[in-house]
Every structure is written in structure tokens, then in C-alpha cells.
From Swiss-Prot:
The lineage of its organism: Bacteria, Bacillati, Actinomycetota, Actinomycetes, Mycobacteriales. Gene3D superfamilies: Anthranilate synthase. GO terms for molecular function: anthranilate synthase activity; metal ion binding. Belongs to the anthranilate synthase component I family. Keywords: Amino-acid biosynthesis, Aromatic amino acid biosynthesis, Lyase, Magnesium, Metal-binding, Tryptophan biosynthesis. This is Anthranilate synthase component 1. Chorismate binds at residues 324-325, 439, 459, 473-475. Its cofactor is Mg(2+). It comes from Mycobacterium tuberculosis (strain CDC 1551 / Oshkosh).
């Protein structure tokens, strides 16, 4: 690794930016063409609470340009007993208590950075609020019945205030280290100290990247995962039959029930991520170490999601409805035949159109009238194991609307609830035993420049106290079959369950697996 030890942001530029903004990123670019995102994560974050790794594989194959590592978060905003709570330092004037969504929006406004034109060359994510919204956050947006048991007691949201970030540029072979200087007390008394502190944190990150790691080369096998299903095939079939009856009665067009699968495991979450990265690369790959109030890891989130809820970039909101699926073929010729079959399937296309309309309606709530449009309607995208029908819906955020407004307008995804959305969620509450928690929520970020990118939390494991929780479901329509839907949910969960089972077998080459 080679580093230019001078910070890219000069003290003079920092003073100018700090006069108008309470968060100023101080950066340093290092040559790191022999590092991988995983090795950089191990060096910079080392599985500490409040750290993360975010990556993307385009169409399940080639890796996107950027990977992001969260190396430090001095505080996090979460929810306790319905109230906004900070786990750590509280930025001056940031709300404590009250509506957590309002507290989040006020915090984003207080800590807004200069726009990208004022700071050219910054990576797409340089700092912000990174974390998750659980599915049950919807109870703050819609009035739903309260029947499902809250057995995991997860917070409705937790977002890290990510101050120390490393952006891995796969095209250049460089890593941009970012230490965000945060003005915690809202005064200009300690500007030079804040700059010096940011440079010192850059020094710590630079030194960490220069340290060697033990070899992580490993072999693995793919055993059958030992897991427990929340429902039997008969029980799940009865749920599907009930929902089909409700659809026939005109209560909904589609409902998306799900069930949870559990697996006992003490495997390191980073090893599960490593396996997912190989076996199920997806547009949204993530590893988060979620802290508790004691500063320890409460639980880990490991995921490989194919689908965004919404992205916001420079005032434009975009969502990509996905509905319609075929498994990938064994050859390119088989893929072409399966694509033609999917494009000719009237049922799949009708479901896709319904979700596109839902996406248009969601964005229409927060976008300037006349700007919402559908692009690339119903085209095929191939992923590592499946292909989907995908469309793009985009719109310009209205005056006074924010990235958080776009997230809440689209939340939860129609692909995880159904249509009409509120009635579908009411029916879900009738048939699911336990609250969904993370499943059907989102994982991603709201940055300090007003942008956002959130993945739908599917193909995701929540790992806590020796148990991994994986949840999956599928859309039920008028002619759905119970046993088919049960197998569909199980197959969707298997990508992650298989990764956990494989991670348990990781061993150095030549190691004796039997222990003899």
C-alpha cells in the first residue's frame, strides 16, 4: 500500500466549509490495488460494533465500482419504547425522545454537508446515517392491527452516524479514507481541533491498512443446512388458501405472506458474508454489526438482496419494481428460452404491471406532478441464480421533500406486502405468527448530502446469540397453490441458509476437519 499522507482537504478549505456546515469530510487517497474489500474491512473494522461493509454486484456477476467500509460510528439513532434514543454522543439540537423519524430528519438537516459540486471527487457515500428500518416501522406510517408476537424485540430502526468511512475504488485500485469532522456543539470554537482530529483518524486508518493479516485462504463444502421452519407445509398451505379466499372476495389483488426459518450457529458473520459473496452475488451485499446500549454487538445483519426499495440522487427518486421470476438455465441458450417464456407469461406480466403502478403511486406522493415516469418497462435482468422482470420508475422530488420522504412514501415495498398495500398488510398481520422485524424492511443509508440508497431486506440473515433468523415468502394471487408457495419461500431462504451451513465448514487448506 502506498499513501500520500497529506489530507486531500486542506486546513484552509476545511475552515471555509466548516463556517457553513457542521459535517466536513476530510479525505486521503491511498493506493491499495492488492487489498480486497474484505481484507480492508478486517483491518479497519475488525467486526467491531457499529461497523459495516456495503458492496454491489451488477446483475449478480461483475462487481460495481465501489465498496464501502464503515470503520467508526460514535453514535447511533434508534428507537426504544416508541421514542427516539441516541446510543452515544448526541449532536447539538438533535431531538432526543419523540418521533424517531422526525428526529432522523432533523439530524440530517443539522448535519447536511456541502453539495457534490462544492466537493468534487468524493465517493458516492462519504458519510451519513447507515443502518436499517425494520418492517414494523410501517406501524408509524399506517394504522395496522397488532396481532403478531414481537418475540425478537428488535428496534424499529437503527442508523449509525458513520463518521469514518473507507471507499474502495475497484476501477482505480485505490481506497479513499474519509474522516468526517462533526461539529457536535454547533459552535466555531474548535474548528482547528476538529481538523486535527480528523487527520489523526486518517492516520489511524492508514496505519491499520498497512498491517498484515493472517491468511484467510480456506476450503469449504456445502452440507445440507439444519434449520427449523416456523410452519409445516400444511399450515402454510392453509394460510395460502385463506388468502386466496380473501382475494376472491375482493379484499386484495395480491398478498405476500412469509415464514421464518431458524438455524443454530456460532459461525462468524463475516464468513457467512464471504460465502454469500461467492454463491449469491447480488446488487446489494451488506454486513452490519449492530450495537446495543452497552457498546457491544447486539446482532449482525448479513444479506444479499437483489432489490432496491428506493434510491435518491441529486433530487431524483428511483425505484425498480421486480416481479416475475425464472431460475437461470444451465447454458446461455437455455437462458434465452427461459427469458422468452417469462416475457410471454401473462400472469407474471400482470403482477409486474400491478407493482409498477404501485411504484408510480408511491413516488407520486412525494414527487413533482408530471415528473414520475416509467423507463425500461418489463425488461429481463439476470442474477446469479434467477432472472426477473424489472422496470424503472423515477420522479423529481417535490419542493421541500427529502430523501427520507421518498423512503417512507415507498415503505414497505409492494413486493413484500401486496396490493392494495394497506389491506394486504392487514391480512399479513392476521396470518403471520410473529412480527417480521428486519424481513421486508430495508438496509442502506441516508447520506449528509441528501441522497439515499436502500435495499429491501430479503435474502438476509439476522444473527444473534447463537441463532440465525432467515425469513422468506412470496406473492399469493387468485390461483396460488399452497404447497408451491411453501416450496417457493423455502427455496428463497435456502440461499442464505446454505451460506451459513457452508461457512461452518470453512477450514485452512489441509486442515483435518474431523478434529482427530
Amino acid at each position: 500500500m502506498h499513501a500520500d499522507l497529506a489530507a486531500t482537504t486542506s486546513r484552509e478549505d476545511f475552515r471555509l466549509l466548516a463556517a457553513e456546515h457542521r459535517v466536513v469530510p476530510v479525505t486521503r487517497k491511498v493506493l491499495a490495488d492488492s487489498e480486497t474489500p474484505l481484507s480492508a474491512y478486517r483491518k479497519l473494522a475488525a467486526n467491531r460494533p457499529g461497523t459495516f461493509l456495503l458492496e454491489s454486484a451488477e446483475n449478480g456477476r461483475s462487481w460495481s465500482r465501489w465498496s464501502f467500509i464503515g470503520a467508526g460510528a460514535p453514535t447511533a439513532l434508534t428507537v426504544r419504547e416508541g421514542q427516539a434514543v441516541w446510543l452515544g454522543a448526541v449532536p447539538k439540537d438533535a431531538p432526543t425522545g419523540g418521533d424517531p423519524l422526525r428526529a432522523l430528519q432533523v439530524t440530517l438537516e443539522l448535519l447536511a454537508t456541502a453539495d457534490r459540486q462544492s466537493e468534487p471527487g468524493l465517493p458516492p457515500l462519504s458519510g451519513g446515517m447507515v443502518g436499517f428500518f425494520a418492517y414494523d416501522m410501517v406501524r408509524r406510517l399506517e394504522r395496522l392491527p397488532e396481532r403478531a408476537v414481537d418475540d425478537l424485540c428488535l428496534p424499529d430502526m437503527l442508523l449509525l452516524l458513520a463518521t469514518d468511512v473507507a471507499a474502495v475504488d475497484h476501477h482505480e485500485g485505490t481506497i479513499t479514507l474519509i474522516a468526517n469532522a462533526v461539529n457536535w456543539n454547533g459552535t466555531d470554537e474548535r474548528v482547528d481541533w476538529a481538523y486535527d482530529d480528523a487527520v489523526a483518524r486518517l492516520d489511524v486508518m492508514t496505519a491499520a491498512l498497512g498491517q498484515p493479516l493472517p491468511s484467510t485462504v480456506a476450503t469449504f463444502s456445502r452440507p445440507e443446512p439444519r434449520h427449523r421452519a416456523q410452519r409445516t407445509v400444511e399450515e402454510y398451505g392453509a394460510i395460502v388458501e385463506y388468502l386466496v379466499d380473501q382475494i376472491a372476495a375482493g379484499e386484495a389483488f395480491q398478498v405476500v405472506p412469509s415464514q421464518r426459518f431458524e438455524m443454530d450457529t456460532d459461525v462468524d458473520p463475516i464468513d457467512v458474508y464471504r460465502i454469500l459473496r461467492v454463491t449469491n452475488p447480488s446488487p446489494y451485499m451488506y454486513l452490519l454489526q449492530v450495537p446495543n446500549s452497552d457498546g457491544a454487538v447486539d446482532f449482525s445483519i448479513v444479506g444479499s438482496s437483489p432489490e432496491a426499495l428506493v434510491t435518491v440522487h441529486e433530487g431524483w427518486a428511483t425505484t425498480h419494481p421486480i416481479a416475475g421470476t425464472r431460475w437461470r438455465g444451465r447454458t446461455d441458450d437455455e437462458d434465452v428460452l427461459l427469458e422468452k417464456e417469462l416475457l410471454a407469461d401473462d400472469k407474471e406480466r400482470a403482477e409486474h404491471l400491478m407493482l409498477v403502478d404501485l411504484g408510480r403511486n408511491d413516488l407520486g406522493r412525494v414527487c413533482t406532478p408530471g415528473t414520475v415516469r416509467v423507463e425500461d418497462y418489463s425488461h429481463i435482468e439476470r442474477y446469479s441464480h434467477v432472472m426477473h422482470l424489472v422496470s424503472t420508475v423515477t420522479g423529481k422530488l417535490g419542493e421541500g421533500r427529502t430523501a427520507l420522504d421518498a423512503v417512507t412514501a415507498c415503505f414497505p415495498a409492494g413486493t413484500l406486502s401486496g396490493a392494495p398495500k394497506v389491506r394486504a398488510m392487514e391480512l399479513i398481520e392476521e396470518v403471520e405468527k410473529t412480527r417480521r422485524g428486519l424481513y421486508g424492511g430495508v438496509v442502506g443509508y441516508l447520506d449528509f448530502a441528501g441522497n439515499a440508497d436502500f435495499a429491501i431486506a430479503i435474502r438476509t440473515a439476522l444473527m444473534r446469540n447463537g441463532t440465525a433468523y432467515v425469513q422468506a415468502g412470496g406473492g399469493v394471487v387468485a390461483d396460488s397453490n399452497g404447497s408451491y408457495e411453501y416450496n417457493e419461500a423455502r427455496n428463497k431462504a435456502r440461499a442464505v441458509l446454505n451460506a451459513i451451513a457452508a461457512a461452518e465448514t470453512l477450514a485452512a487448506p489441509g486442515a483435518n476437519r474431523s478434529g482427530c
